[in-house]
Each structure stands twice: as structure tokens, then as C-alpha cells.
């Protein structure tokens, strides 16, 4: 595996972890809830994280 492939896999792993984190928050607090700091609903965060994972998978 070359350096670029390794970096892509590392970033993919990080993006998957972020997706897992928002899924956990949705299960705890609900899909329409949001963080007080920025008021972004969990539904939007989920869509963003899914998009990030899809982008990384396409790079693999």
C-alpha cells in the first residue's frame, strides 16, 4: 500500500467514526434535535456525514 492509499483509508476511517458518532447522538436525543451551539439539526449532520463517507468510498 502506498502513502496515498494509506491516507485515504485513514481519512475514510475517521469519516466512518464521525458517522457512527452522529448515529449514536440521534439514537440518544432524536433526529430532529440539535446542538445548542450551532442549531444544526441532527438530520442535517447525518446527511453531511453520510456524504463524507460516500466521497471517501469513491476515492477508494
Predicted regions and their residues:
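Flexible "arm" and connector segments at domain edges
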Residues: 1-60
Amino acid at each position: 500500500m502506498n502513502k496515498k492509499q494509506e491516507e485515504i483509508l485513514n481519512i475514510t476511517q475517521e469519516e466512518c467514526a464521525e458517522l457512527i458518532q452522529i448515529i449514536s447522538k440521534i439514537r440518544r436525543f432524536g433526529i430532529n434535535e440539535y446542538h445548542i451551539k450551532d442549531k444544526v439539526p441532527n438530520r442535517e449532520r447525518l446527511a453531511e456525514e453520510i456524504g463524507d463517507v460516500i466521497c471517501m468510498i469513491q476515492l477508494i
